[in-house]
A protein has these predicted regions:
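Cleavable N-terminal export/targeting peptides
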Residues: 1-25, 203
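Acidic pyrophosphate-coordinating catalytic loop
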Residues: 127-131
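Feature captures outer-membrane beta-barrel proteins of Gram-negative bacteria and organelles
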Residues: 42-53, 68-87, 101-118, 132-146, ...
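Intrinsic disorder/low-complexity detector
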Residues: 18, 31, 35, 138-141, ...
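Transmembrane beta-strand segments that form the barrel wall of outer-membrane beta-barrel proteins
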Residues: 26-36, 48, 52-64, 71, ...
């Protein structure tokens, strides 16, 4: 419910901007990352997005912290032919166990069968400045065929306890039509690594 409330807030705040644009089709996505964390609470991290032309709206839950939601508005840029790039600067509000404002970004760079993807945000905690933090998730992947990819992944998060400031690992992913499934294996040299299963749908 909090995730839906996040998206509703963003939609309400941007109603005027949407109607001021040319008539373009909405594009939506919904995804959930399920974290299996050693000696800690397992949890799901859902995200929904809505894009219309340059406008980008996004809502997340359990991303910055558990039992915490965030709502985002951003602007889509893209370009290139052989070297294709996309960049979405964003600004969001965070509320729940953590209350903050956060500038952020999402971006990708693609060439041949290689892709670099990164998303990040600087969370400025409105209660305790010492709790402010930079969150990041980055991937570099190779797709030998259209439906399969593998590569490396890193993340920096405070959603759960970890001895590592930057966690790193391996990933594999498959896609079929509008469905995308990924598996992430963080800190493979630990006795008990962290696993993440991601399922996403574009519509």
């Amino acid at each position: 419910m909090r995730l839906l409330a996040c998206l509703a807030i963003v939609l309400a705040l941007t109603e005027h901007a949407v109607f001021a644009q040319d008539e373009t089709a909405w594009e939506f996505s919904a995804s959930a990352n399920t974290y299996f964390v050693p000696d800690d609470r397992n949890y799901a991290q859902p995200t929904v997005t809505a894009d219309r032309g340059r406008l980008h709206l996004e809502a997340r839950y359990n991303y910055e912290a558990l039992e915490t939601g965030s709502a985002w508005i951003g602007y889509n840029f893209s370009g290139g032919k052989t070297l294709v790039w996309e960049l979405t600067p964003m600004f969001g509000g965070v509320f729940g166990d953590t209350t903050a404002v956060a500038p952020g970004y999402k971006g990708s760079l693609s060439w041949w069968k290689l892709e670099l993807y990164s998303e990040g945000e600087q969370v400025f905690d409105t209660g305790e400045s010492s709790d402010s933090f930079f969150y990041n998730w980055s991937e570099v992947t190779l797709a030998p065929v259209d439906w399969f990819r593998f590569g490396l992944v890193t993340q920096r998060t405070r959603a759960y306890e970890s001895d590592r400031d930057i966690q790193r690992g391996l990933l594999v992913g498959v896609n079929y039509k509008k469905l995308d499934v990924g598996a992430y294996f963080f800190n493979p040299d630990d006795e008990e690594p962290t696993f993440v299963i991601s399922v996403g749908l574009n519509f």
